[in-house]
Amino acid sequence: MVSSCCGSVCSDQSCGQGLGQESCCRPSCCQTTCCRTTCCRPSCCISSCCRPSCCISSCCKPSCCRTTCCRPSCCISSCCRPSCCISSCCKPSCCRTTCCRPSCCISSCCRPSCCISSCCKPSCCQTTCCRPSCCISSCYRPQCCQPSCCRPACCISSCCHPSCCVSSCRCPFSCPTTCCRTTCFHPICCGSSCC
């Protein structure tokens, strides 16, 4: 005897008998016409049943990873795809090159592959993240002092390297005593305190 399954007709006669809709969410019963909010159960998570209304935490499987299914409860390592890169879905397991977006820049997501200009935050200042596009005032740490990162705001005592001694690296008060080194003795840097 055929029973009703989630508002449609069940494909398996053994489905939906006795326990109603709960017993109806079986792989053999999960047809596209059977995907309703009331039918979203773990056993119902198959490719043909991945609809937005079915996107609940218990239904987050790789086969269900679609743009319409990107929700915080669905952020698992097997579901980290570019289309799922939203602020609420930024977890360490999701930190991949395709997921480097400003809203995804969290301390646990600072990896070399994520070092892009839009991802330069203080918490991301690591040696592997020292790139020209990442040279902002909040990101100037000693290990970031590279020739490509020599900017006026980067002129601090810990950043006085020969490679950083360029005209654009003048400190506000000429050359501080900590910067007075023979390797850094450029005419543009020769102030009264540096003689």
Curated annotation (Swiss-Prot):
Domain of life the protein comes from: Eukaryota
GO cellular component: cytosol; keratin filament
Tissue: Expressed specifically in the middle/uper portions of the hair cortex. Not detected in the hair matrix or cuticle.
Any Pfam family the entry gives: Keratin_B2_2
Record keywords, A-Z: Keratin, Repeat
Alphabetical list of InterPro entries matching this protein: KAP
Organism lineage string: Eukaryota, Metazoa, Chordata, Craniata, Vertebrata
Keyword Repeat: yes
Self-association and partners: Interacts with hair keratins.
Name used for this protein in its record: Keratin-associated protein 4-3
Similarity comment: family membership: Belongs to the KRTAP type 4 family.
Ranges of the Sequence repeats in the UniProt entry: 34-38, 39-43, 44-48, 49-53, 54-58, 59-63, 64-68, 69-73, 74-78, 79-83, 84-88, 89-93, 94-98, 99-103, 104-108, 109-113, 114-118, 119-123, 124-128, 129-133, 134-138, 144-148, 149-153, 154-158, 159-163, 164-168, 179-183, 189-193
GO biological process terms on file: hair cycle
Function: In the hair cortex, hair keratin intermediate filaments are embedded in an interfilamentous matrix, consisting of hair keratin-associated proteins (KRTAP), which are essential for the formation of a rigid and resistant hair shaft through their extensive disulfide bond cross-linking with abundant cysteine residues of hair keratins. The matrix proteins include the high-sulfur and high-glycine-tyrosine keratins.
Segments of this protein annotated with the region 29 X 5 AA repeats of C-C-[GIKRQVH]-[SPT]-[STA]: 34-193
